[in-house]
Amino acid sequence: MNLHPRDIDETPDRDAAAAALAVLRRWASGATSTEISELDPSVARLLPDAALSNYPDLSRQYPEDFTVDATYRAGLPDLQNGPSSLIRGAKQQIQHVGISNFRLPIRFHRKEGDDLTLETSVTGTVSLEAGKKGINMSRIMRSFYKHAERTFSFEVIEAALDDYMTDLDSFDARIQMRFSYPERIESLRSGLSGYQYYDIALELVEQGGERLKIMHLDYVYSSTCPCSLELSEHARSSRGQLATPHSQRSVARLSVVVDGDASCLWFEDLIALCRRAVPTETQVMVKREDEQAFAELNAANPIFVEDAARLFCAELLADHRIGDFRVVASHQESLHSHDAVSVLTEGATFATASLDPRLFATLFHVG
């Protein structure tokens, strides 16, 4: 009997493939692992629950006793320090790359009294040259932690910046530290006092070989609308109608470049500057006499958002310790469904043609 095999170049259809698969499974079910490996190790995958003889037997237990020596460490892959051929996308310089919001307790000097230890959120970034793949971000944290036990000032931040610029071989760098700073504030008339918390950030920037020391402060105050105040008084005087002017909680964010050659600009100094410019700071502890006093204080200092920006500006211009600055104010209207906002800048540091779309949305008080 002569057998005429089918043309092996013929493309099988699905039924032919299913038949061949069934044949392989029947054969593999009775074959040894050696026979399967000799034919093709992948055939073993056709068997349900069959161990794959070509797959390594890996441990699933965490090796608690394993230790890393210098030789092992040297052999670990380091993709971020790889060749430029590994770069994905455009080979372009990155101005800022690093880590944001790593937190630790930091000790700060006060103008008077003992130092304070405050939970601090740190952001550290460096520039990345066009031909470099990436950075080892943990080095930023390690460099910062070398100084974490010191009482912080701009001088200590500079030392930390020097360390991680050296460790990461970068030419530009930035450190920003955010924290909530408490100050005990006395009530207007009752003699009570309580802690007011101020959102403060210290920022040190090295760019093009020059360093800038920047302090940011959020100041929360009450703004009484001058127009609403006059309209309310008109209703009272002309028609005997009781009316209430609208006022609202408002926030100003002051960002100032600190003159490194001048005397120290304390946190308390910048807070006092804000209070001189706009004295209607929100209160902490109040009794009835304090609430009445606050109403009188607001009536004596009605203020549009334009006024706020210029009043802060006047105080900032008068302080020789302050260079360039920016004032961003937001009056969160009780009359309108929208906010009234203003931005005033002095000098080139904060001048920009574009604003962050979320800038004004960040100006709110967290109780």
Curated annotation (Swiss-Prot):
Functional pathway: Cofactor biosynthesis; 7,8-dihydroneopterin triphosphate biosynthesis; 7,8-dihydroneopterin triphosphate from GTP: step 1/1
Molecular functions per Gene Ontology: GTP cyclohydrolase I activity
Key word Hydrolase present: yes
GO BP: any one term: tetrahydrofolate biosynthetic process
Reactions that this protein is recorded to catalyse: GTP + H2O = 7,8-dihydroneopterin 3'-triphosphate + formate + H(+)
Pfam families: GCHY-1
Transmembrane segments: none
Role according to the record: Converts GTP to 7,8-dihydroneopterin triphosphate.
Family named by the database record: Belongs to the GTP cyclohydrolase IV family.
Protein name: GTP cyclohydrolase FolE2
Organism field: Ruegeria pomeroyi (strain ATCC 700808 / DSM 15171 / DSS-3) (Silicibacter pomeroyi)
